[in-house]
């Protein structure tokens, strides 16, 4: 099945502590999760790695969030939207369900 949300899509969080926040998808994981820029930040305690000259400490980084908890953001309407698929010139393309506009 084709992915409805892909890397570099702008998404909005639907549920959880970051509800309503927007960000760009950095990575889509095969486990049905996505990593979004600036969303679901967690603090990770990291050991120093002298071989790589990497200091230890508490590092803040993005954690994965379920793909069902985010929706693609439609800039034309300014709201979250659903994604559909159709064929244009023999190619499968994604489109916004609300206004039938093709996504990138």
UniProtKB/Swiss-Prot annotation:
Alphabetically ordered keywords of this record: Ribonucleoprotein, Ribosomal protein, RNA-binding, rRNA-binding
Family matches, as Gene3D superfamilies: 2.30.30.30
PROSITE patterns: RIBOSOMAL_L24 (PS01108)
CDD domains found in the cross-reference section: KOW_RPL26
GO cellular component labels: cytosol; ribonucleoprotein complex; ribosome
GO molecular function, one term: structural constituent of ribosome
InterPro entries listed in its UniProt record: KOW, Rib_uL2_dom2, Ribosomal_uL24, Ribosomal_uL24_CS, Ribosomal_uL24_KOW, Translation_prot_SH3-like_sf
A Pfam family this chain is assigned to: KOW
One example of a Gene Ontology biological process annotation: translation
Function noted in UniProt: One of two assembly initiator proteins, it binds directly to the 5'-end of the 23S rRNA, where it nucleates assembly of the 50S subunit. One of the proteins that surrounds the polypeptide exit tunnel on the outside of the subunit.
Family designation: Belongs to the universal ribosomal protein uL24 family.
HAMAP family: Ribosomal_uL24_B
Subunit structure: Part of the 50S ribosomal subunit.
Name recorded for this polypeptide: Large ribosomal subunit protein uL24
């Amino acid at each position: 099945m084709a992915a409805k949300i892909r890397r570099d899509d702008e998404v909005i969080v639907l549920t959880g502590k970051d509800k309503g926040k927007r960000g760009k998808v950095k990575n889509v994981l095969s486990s049905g999760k996505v990593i979004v820029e600036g969303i679901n930040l967690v603090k990770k305690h990291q050991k120093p790695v002298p071989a790589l000259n990497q200091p230890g400490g508490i590092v803040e980084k993005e954690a994965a969030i379920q793909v069902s908890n985010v929706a693609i953001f439609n800039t034309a309407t300014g709201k979250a939207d659903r994604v559909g698929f159709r064929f244009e010139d023999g190619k499968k393309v994604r489109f916004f369900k609300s206004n039938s506009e093709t996504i990138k």
